[in-house]
């Protein structure tokens, strides 16, 4: 969690300071208008029911009976969109047989790292979501795989997500290749060291913008061009972006 937002982690865990964020404020829109988070949560719930084999029909009735969705065309269209998005992910999953839960501990020198990783099927760790996978979520998936590899399992990770292109929901598949046990342990130890530093000072690391920066390097973009792209993303980002995050803006600033 400290790498997902190092600024927030430092303020909350080291200083005990919490700021109000956009999601903490009272919504100014009508209650029947779904925001992106509510749409995502609805689709995630539908996907969980599909995977577990539980009844979608019972859940649908509960949504309308409780008032979480309005009866009529609007509520039905919202539900239909959520189920469609969940179905696009579900149809790309190969969760056959008994799921494996990887658990144990890894000696990282000064720290013994313990934990567990779920959703293992046939030597593959499945990471899926009905939304787009952000850089911070990709980093989390990578750390989980390193933990599994450091336990001695030669497991890869398959990531399944969605992306909206020209108004159409597209499925994206990507993979993280396994690394050998020693390399995985070494990399985990480096993350442990970063965590210790994160309790001393806020790490100057912004997952989304950092990811965009390295993608620009891979595309051989000129430094001036990629710098301009990052500054623009920070200054003109949408709600929920790092440039709009209260914790980041208390610590970092970019030229305008």
Report the location of each language-model feature.
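Structural signature of nuclease core domains in nucleic-acid processing machines
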Residues: 1-256
